[in-house]
Swiss-Prot record:
This is Sulfite reductase [NADPH] hemoprotein beta-component. Siroheme binds at C496. It catalyses: hydrogen sulfide + 3 NADP(+) + 3 H2O = sulfite + 3 NADPH + 4 H(+). GO terms for cellular component: sulfite reductase complex (NADPH). It comes from Colwellia psychrerythraea (strain 34H / ATCC BAA-681). Binds 1 siroheme per subunit. Binds 1 [4Fe-4S] cluster per subunit. Belongs to the nitrite and sulfite reductase 4Fe-4S domain family. Its cofactor is siroheme; [4Fe-4S] cluster.
Length: 584
């Protein structure tokens, strides 16, 4: 059942007005080619100019600079230290040991930070790649069967899939659908291969032949898709535009419930922007998956707001035209009717750490990677963790694959009984297994933010470890040592850290200042509500102390923190985002 507006009288299907400049940019880009090749040859600047600054996103890159040294470089009359961040396309998050060793070496040899960053999009990122090494980076990925096509920009991005190593057969089929969806919705232009892999350009003039689904102007805004296997909502369906919820009978996949219109990004001070949970359109047999995916994407392509990019996501299109109208158009385009949704339930999120055995007899080891940062940390005493070296040593002997999770962790999957001991030994020797990690730390997550993200308003990744130290102490003081709160920090309101589905969500407002949101639930089916604005770091701890003390004293048996703050009247529940999220 929808918690949003199902019917809108006289819906506006097409938003009229002067289109955003990004629409001109895409139309003039020659199907995402632009003049990127020319920019690559320009060594007078380390960055990309004009339209190419935006266009490289559709090739999986963002132009960034090191913000820690930006001011000093300005004093020296130098341009910012431009570099790119690359996000790989990795449907379902699966990568094999050969591929891992290749990205490990590239990170060592050609990135400024020497790390591999696992992300909430179930893939990895390189940070700090300088212009002369960008083409080599893409060719390195290609040499091991990887790419970064459409992992950013106004396209369908990396397709997520539940990391479920136990239900091996079901997970395998769900993963295969994630891969099929990714391939089906990819841009068809050969721009990526021509620019980065030196493929010869083939001339064509028929726009529909080049981009039959995305169109010559691509999508109004980014579009995110997932495949999820209940009861674990590990990929946070309500953060995504399109979700296929696996329905099984007797352990076999029979089809999907289709959820449309989730999304978390917003803009501080703009009440026309808000996070929103997705609507359940109904059930489809699995053979209709690609047709429905294309129909949802093309409906959003044609009806999405190309005038105001802040209101261009699918969630706003649904609220503007009404869920029923959007759903009917999807059915018309696909030639398929949704049937009544099949029963399912999300009971939890997050990853289960340690060893599990799948029904295929293979063993799977889920490793907690704080903030997803795989690097050799050379701290004092017990703080030293050679995570990157450890992963390299495991990759050298591992015969299965690695599965990156949407919670920035990693599964060493498909381990035989005879290899379990050596895999665990390597993991422990290099700090990849730490039995002392608390439930609270495992329940906490942050986006990258400073020093690389140009949008960050406050710290996130660098702030979180110390914050969790303090929260652990607060919980223990309040008699909650064995409990945890889903805590997420994001450096800006764009939502990469999924703070808008946290029991406590901290959203950067300025240096050392955060807006504090409370009230999501354990299953991730509710967006939180603003509790306090512009809270400094000391204030954050003070509020968590007071709130957790009340939770400890007043909660019902087994009541989660997010449920408690709503029942206790600390914040109001957000039911309809458009109506409730900004309501004082």
């Amino acid at each position: 059942m929808s918690n949003n507006f199902t019917k809108v009288e006289n819906p506006v299907l097409i938003v009229e007005g002067k289109q955003a400049d990004n629409e001109r940019l895409k139309a003039e880009s020659d199907y995402l080619r632009g003049t990127i090749k020319d920019d690559l040859q320009d060594r007078m600047t380390g960055g990309f100019t004009s339209d190419n600054f935006q266009l490289i996103r559709t090739h999986g890159m963002y132009q960034q600079d090191d913000r820690d040294i930006r001011a000093e470089r300005q004093k020296q009359k130098l341009e910012p230290l431009h570099n790119v961040m690359l996000r790989a396309r990795l449907p379902g998050g699966i990568i094999n040991p050969t591929q891992w060793l290749a990205i490990d070496k590239f990170a060592d040899d050609y990135t400024s930070y020497g790390s591999i960053r696992l992300t909430t999009r179930q893939t990895f990122q390189f940070h700090g790649v300088l212009k002369p090494n960008i083409k080599l980076m893409h060719q390195t990925l290609n040499s091991v069967g990887l790419d970064s096509i459409a992992t950013a920009g106004d396209v369908n991005r990396n397709v997520l899939c539940t990391s479920n190593p136990v239900e091996s057969a079901l997970h395998q089929e769900a993963y295969e659908w994630a891969t099929k969806i990714s391939e089906h919705l990819l841009p068809k232009t050969r721009a990526y291969a021509e620019i980065w892999l030196d493929e010869e350009k083939v001339e064509t003039t028929e726009a529909d032949e080049i981009e039959p689904i995305l169109g010559s102007n691509y999508l109004p805004r980014k579009f995110k898709t997932t495949v999820v296997i209940p009861p674990n909502n590990d990929i946070d369906v309500h953060a995504n535009d399109l979700n296929f919820v696996a329905i099984s009978e007797g352990g076999e996949l029979i089809g999907f419930n289709v959820l449309v219109g989730g999304g978390l990004a917003m803009t501080h001070g703009d009440k026309a922007t808000y996070p929103r949970c997705a609507d359940d359109f109904g059930f489809i047999p699995k053979e209709h998956t690609l047709a429905i995916a294309a129909a949802v994407v093309t409906t959003q392509r044609d009806w999405g707001n190309r005038v105001n990019r802040k209101n261009a996501k699918t969630k706003y299109t649904l609220d503007r035209v009404g869920v029923d109208t959007f759903k009917a158009e999807v059915e018309r385009r696909a030639g398929i009717k949704f049937s009544e949704s099949r029963s399912y339930e999300f009971t939890h999120r997050g990853d289960s750490f340690g060893w599990v055995e799948g029904i295929d007899g293979k063993n799977h080891l889920t490793l907690f990677i704080e903030n997803g940062r795989i690097l050799d940390f050379n701290g004092a005493n017990s703080d030293s963790k050679a995570l990157k070296t450890g992963m390299r040593e495991i990759a050298k002997i591992h015969k299965g694959d690695f599965r990156l999770t949407a919670n920035q962790n990693l599964i060493v999957a498909g381990v035989s009984a005879e290899d379990k001991t050596i895999i665990e030994q390597l993991a422990r020797e290099h700090g990849l297994i730490n039995d002392g990690v608390s439930n609270q730390r495992k329940s906490s997550m942050a986006c990258v933010a400073f020093p690389t993200c140009p949008l960050a308003m406050a710290e996130a990744e660098r702030y979180l470890p110390g914050l969790v130290d303090d929260v652990e102490a607060i919980l223990e003081k309040n008699g909650l040592k064995d409990d945890s709160i889903i805590l997420r920090v994001t450096g800006c309101p764009n939502g990469c850290g999924r703070a808008m589905l946290a029991e406590i969500g901290l959203v950067g407002k300025g240096p050392g200042k955060y807006n504090m949101y409370l009230g999501s639930d354990l299953a991730g089916s509710r967006v939180p509500k603003l509790y306090k604005e512009n809270v400094d770091e000391a204030g954050v701890l003070s509020e968590i102390d007071a709130l957790s003390a009340r939770w400890s004293a007043e909660r019902n048996d087994g009541e989660a923190f997010g449920d408690f703050v709503i029942r206790a009247g600390i914040v109001e529940q957000v039911i309809v985002s458009f109506r409730d999220f900004h309501h004082a």
